[in-house]
Amino acid sequence: MFEKTGIASREMVMSVFPSIERINKGPVAVVECYQKIPCNPCETACPAGAIRVGDDINNIPARDEDRCTGCGRCVAKCPGLSIMIVDGSKSAKTVEFRIPYEFLPLPQAGETVVGLDRAGQPICEARVVRVTNPPAFDRTPVVTVEVDRAYLYDFRNIRTEA
């Protein structure tokens, strides 16, 4: 089905998600890259060496959740917008996601936005915590949102109402 729709199945999502124990320790990357393509900016961006593509640039990136510091440098560098950071250490009821967001207008901190699943369907409300857009991100802002834990494996993006 993925080949026709581009929408990852639950099994695919779970295969790339860090363990819940790691998520609860602090920020960690989720690399939702499911196809072999010639790409490695995530590997070169990672200062901890936690994302590896290897000698063949077509390899699917592998993330070492123990080495990942959750710095987020990989998020804005991924041309496929396939990486997000998840952090479950701040609350028992919510998780924070840092996602690439290349739409205008950018949301503002404190704003409530619509949380979307991988098919682009509304699933929840999300509270914008911050928006980061330094020149080093090369016009790929990263939006941090807080989402109810019930949507940990379903949340993928946001929609503003503007």
Where are the predicted features?
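Local cysteine-cluster metal-coordination motifs and their immediate loop/turn environment
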Residues: I37-G49, D66-L81
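Short, well-ordered loop/turn sites that connect or cap secondary structure elements
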Residues: L106-Q108
